[in-house]
Amino acid sequence: MTTAKADSETSTKQRRWPLALFGAILAVIGLVLAVGGIQLAALGGSWYYILAGAALLVAGGLLAARRVAGAWLFGLTAVATVVWALAEVGLNFWMLVPRLAPFLVLAFVLALLLPQLPGVRSRRVPHLLAGVLGLGLVAGGVAVFQPHGVIQAAAAPKVQRNSATAGVGGDWQHYGRTPAGTRFAPFDQINPGNVDQLEVAWTYRTGEIADGASEFQNTPLQVDDTVFVCTPLNKVIALDAENGQERWKFDPKVEDRKTWNRCRGLGYYEPAKVEQPYAFAEDLDWQQSHPAAPGGNGTCASRIVMTTIDARLLQIDAKTGELCEDFGQNGAVDLTVGMGKVDYDNVLWYYLTSAPTVVRNMIIIGGWTFDGRSVDEPSGVIRAFSADSGELLWAWDMGQPEITKLPPEGGSYSRSTPNVWSTPAFDEELGLVYLPTGNQQPDFWGGHRPETTEKHSSAVVALDILTGRERWTYQTVHHDIWDYDIAAQPALYDIPDGKGGVTPALVQLTKRGQIFLLDRRDGRPLAEVEERPVPQTVAAGDWVAKTQPYSVGMPALGAEPLTEADMWGATFFDQLACRIAFRKLNYEGEFTAPSTKPTLLYPGYYGGFNWGSAAIDEDRGYLFLNDIRIPQVVTLIPHSEVDESKLVAGHGVGSTYPMQGTPFVIDHEAFNSPLGIPCNAPPWGVFAAVDLNTRQLVW
């Protein structure tokens, strides 16, 4: 009897310990939520976590003591959580995940353990409940891999014809396929009926290794049967489009300075196919000494144009991969001429990462400058060169507009002016090139900026192609101290005017998620723009504009202000941590000025819309775009509080910029949870279509 009784007690304890363990875990979860909830409520946040945490703490204790009341209390808390979650975020799938998924998992485990509670005589009901909850978990797991929040088109668009890029042909000779930057391939061999059957045709490996400094961001060119690619270190490779076999490789021998190695695109120039070349006095001597080869079949009859990360402009024979030595000095133009100081301790603060713009027999280039270094950085000057000789044709220096070519001997182009690091578009008929400008260095501070250059910051600027003189400017951010510079290439499109004609339009995407629709003849908005008041709090020594432009006549993507309810996590805990972090931040919307208190930027300096730009199906009048929804946190720190010798000399998130010549350095990082996941709820980007004729979001 004694042995049997002991065995029975041992068996009972073995059956009880899983419930006791579950109760203890539930109590710990409740304690953490309650403590975090107290902190959140003290910051003005939701009281839910205090109440739910306390309830789970008590329920866990009761379950550990084998009290049925613990199960009932847990169930009531779960039901209350469902009501709270639906009230806070509705039926938004991704927002419901961290609110309900943990309860679903806990409820499933509890259902399996219910038979261990006194008074629960049947296993059938608990196991049936566990089965239902288990199916819910499986369904939720499947739903994670399904699209959510999809907006579908009501009907197929009416096909129309558009002449903005007529006669471009089947090649991809420009970074955005066309001079208008439409980057849409109107081909039909790949279509919705067979896209799922595509297989890899060939693979080519460049031999370069991606590291912290290098990223492969190239959009290849395709001319006839050849694909032209450039690598982060500016190697140019010609490949057979059919089989991927290398035809030639050109290495310009740039130094890997481990900073910001990119080559986003190339230019293509074929002199014999330029029907109406521009006539420049600078080229007369060159043309007399370089008679055209019959039929354009001589050396360098077709040329690849490249800018490099050591600030050179090169031309390469598209057939052989050899330098075109009659261009510039032995095939190269030194782009540092007239720029003043550009080399700082073997780190270049000026070079080029985007594709050069080839307009007939001209090459137009801007330049990349190192973000956040100083108030004294290289110029954002725009220059045009002869595509034949490499001679400088004109320069546009917004700080010294009287300089139309090289600056006076001993001088330089205006320092730290807004640059054009992205890609322009151009309209040959109107004779205009459209520049997407950056904001003036050092990005997050503007107390020193002169009025002469302020108006060109974060703007679309139209220049006369022949002279480089400004024709019009439209600014998308006033006094930009958020790094909301224009990264996307302008896209040109002719909008039907309803009277049988068209209006030449320019579509400009911005990092703010705003889409501006402008008349490309004069910069006048074609879709309504409102100037809205914005927060006026700013660090001492700087200022903010009273209003900012909002393109209310076009859809905006990802531009809604964040709230505490938008905070996300994979679990209870990281969502709560993000809610607490959000409440601690300085945030009054997208134009909250950087301050000495950590400040939330959203949409951040990644966008909205970045340099990937948009595509336009001109026959249907559809604008295709994808946005980024990743917030950042920035903090101004007085120089006196920083050991500047230990600053992280980076270019992206997670680094500190010295901003020499200002009162502060700027620290910036991603707004992530403790698990390294963005604190805002998915989606972290969408792909969408906008009807440019109705100006409505289609899908």
Segments from the language model and where they lie:
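Long, low-complexity segments enriched in small/aliphatic residues
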Residues: 425, 548, 552-632, 640-641, ...
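N-terminal pre-domain segments of enzymes
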Residues: 140-186, 545-571, 651-655
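Short, solvent-exposed loop/turn elements at domain surfaces
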Residues: 179-186, 208-213, 237, 443-444, ...
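Repeat-blade elements of multi-bladed beta-propeller folds
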Residues: 172-176, 213-233, 260-312, 348-374, ...
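Extracytoplasmic/lumenal domain signature
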Residues: 194-207, 236-260, 268-280, 313-347, ...
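N-terminal amphipathic, basic-rich helices that act as targeting or association modules
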Residues: 140-169, 191-195, 204, 223, ...
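Asp/Glu-centered strand-loop micro-motifs enriched in Gly/Pro and often flanked by an aromatic residue
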Residues: 185-195, 200-228, 252-253, 281, ...
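Topology signature of small-to-medium multi-pass alpha-helical membrane proteins
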Residues: 2-155
